[in-house]
Regions:
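Conserved phosphate- and dinucleotide-binding cores of soluble alpha/beta proteins
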Residues: 4-136, 141
């Protein structure tokens, strides 16, 4: 949940739901035990999850344990989940693992050898629709 995006919504007819919890100003997010309790009762068709890093050992990871727990719950409560991660974060291990690579569908901007360990992946190139790759690849969302 990136609270900075709230200022970018141009249409006041768009409904936005914000979960309660602890505000984390360094990453513009809301997380913590209250957020986790609310998310445990929510279910999603599709989820798009961000990450601070991606490595073979640390999987999809983040600097904050509350963020890692939130990502895990959203992933587990979604019919489909996609991790959005730019290529600069490959090979990066931050403090807390959120997800294993083999349980993730990754969407990124450049190919990296770690993508072969993902459940599926898509490389989105500027100006063209992403193409699914890997075992069990999902169609472009």
């Amino acid at each position: 949940s990136n609270t900075h995006l709230l200022n970018l919504v141009p249409d006041d007819r768009i409904k936005i739901t914000i979960l309660a919890g602890e505000y984390l100003p360094s990453i513009g997010s809301i997380a913590g035990s209250l957020t986790e309790r609310l998310l445990n009762d929510m279910f999603f068709d599709k989820a798009f999850i961000g990450a601070s890093g991606c490595s073979a050992k640390a999987g999809i990871n983040t600097f904050d344990i509350r963020e890692a727990a939130k990502k895990r719950i959203v992933h587990d409560n979604s019919n489909e989940s996609f991790v959005l991660i730019d290529s600069t974060k490959f090979g990066t291990s931050t403090l807390f693992k959120a997800l294993e690579l083999n349980e993730c569908a990754l969407i990124t901007d450049q190919y990296h050898e770690l993508l072969a360990s993902a459940r599926s992946y898509q490389v989105a190139e500027p100006g063209e629709a992403p193409r699914a790759k890997g075992a069990g690849a999902a169609a472009a969302p």
